[in-house]
């Protein structure tokens, strides 16, 4: 009996660790790629095809094709990386229209990333969006080719799949009420194209991110902020990412009275029978750093 119990708990904890490491790799890679616009380098130079469309958008109410927008109207601030600190369902719904009520686990961070893929596209899909660029000018379009481009992208040129994502912790894994917190992301992979939900790892109970801001323009972080403004995010050069993971099954012989202190989230003293671990990593955000060093 004891051997069976030990095996079950080892398996439970091992699965939690594997899931958490996978989740950390996924979000760390996406954050490190924020602001990658292929050879174009500068998001503000992206132009938009006249027939660019999106099925399910995911921006503030009233803003059309927000997921495609590389910069903020009016300020010109880059939208490559955005943060909602210790979000609630109300704050995430105001910023991202594709979230449904009660989906987010309140008090966890939400991270929005805009970038293109790391390699040129092969065959183009009618249900995807692309950046066509020659390194001097670029056009964002949906479908297999731009039909009303505002600028001509002369050869040699390449097409790059547009890969925006929004990471968050969902309250449930498979259905509302199952109470299995899960790291998910909204991604531009639905028909239309449009935003859809992809879940990465179950048992992720909290996501916290601290952003390294370069205030002296030397390419290195001077301060780490958990709740940066969009203006401050223009000089982000790195990020520290924290995940709190728990087992999906309880351990009937265990009570978890540990205190978990992660970033600026309130301390957690669960008092339940789930095993937990904190996983963390740091990443450099080279694309935004390079733009800053270029004085863009």
What residues fall within each predicted segment?
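Glycine-rich, histidine-containing beta strand-loop boundary motifs that form or position
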Residues: 3, 20, 35
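C-terminal juxtamembrane segment of a hydrophobic transmembrane alpha-helix
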Residues: 1-10
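N-terminal pilin/flagellin-like segments and related low-complexity appendage regions
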Residues: 13, 23-238, 242, 250-275, ...
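Short, polar/charged loop or turn motifs at beta-strand boundaries
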Residues: 12-18
């Amino acid at each position: 009996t004891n051997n069976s119990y030990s095996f079950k708990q080892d398996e439970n904890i091992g699965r939690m660790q594997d899931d958490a490491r996978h989740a950390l790799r996924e979000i760390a890679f996406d954050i490190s790629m924020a602001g990658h616009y292929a050879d174009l380098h500068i998001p503000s130079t992206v132009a938009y095809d006249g027939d660019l469309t999106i099925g399910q958008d995911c921006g503030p109410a009233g803003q059309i094709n927000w997921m495609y927008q590389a910069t903020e109207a009016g300020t010109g601030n880059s939208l490559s990386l955005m943060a909602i600190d210790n979000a609630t369902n109300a704050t995430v719904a105001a910023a991202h229209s594709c979230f449904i009520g009660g989906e987010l686990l309140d008090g966890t961070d939400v991270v929005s990333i805009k970038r293109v893929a790391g390699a040129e596209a092969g065959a183009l899909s009618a249900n995807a969006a692309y950046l066509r660029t020659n390194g001097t000018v670029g056009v964002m379009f949906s479908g297999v080719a731009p039909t009303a481009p505002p600028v001509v992208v002369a050869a040699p040129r390449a097409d790059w799949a547009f890969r925006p994502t929004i990471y968050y912790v969902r309250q449930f894994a498979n259905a509302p009420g199952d109470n299995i917190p899960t790291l998910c992301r909204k991604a531009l992979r639905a028909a239309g194209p449009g935003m859809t939900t992809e879940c990465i790892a179950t048992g992720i109970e909290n996501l916290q991110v601290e952003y390294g801001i370069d205030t002296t323009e030397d390419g290195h972080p001077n301060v780490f902020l958990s709740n940066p403004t969009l203006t401050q995010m223009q000089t982000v050069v790195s990020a520290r990412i924290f995940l709190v993971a728990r087992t999906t099954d309880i351990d009937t012989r265990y009570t978890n009275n540990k205190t978990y202190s992660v970033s600026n989230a309130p301390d957690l003293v669960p008092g339940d029978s789930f095993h937990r671990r904190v996983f963390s990593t740091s990443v450099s955000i080279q694309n935004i750093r390079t733009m800053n060093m270029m004085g863009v």
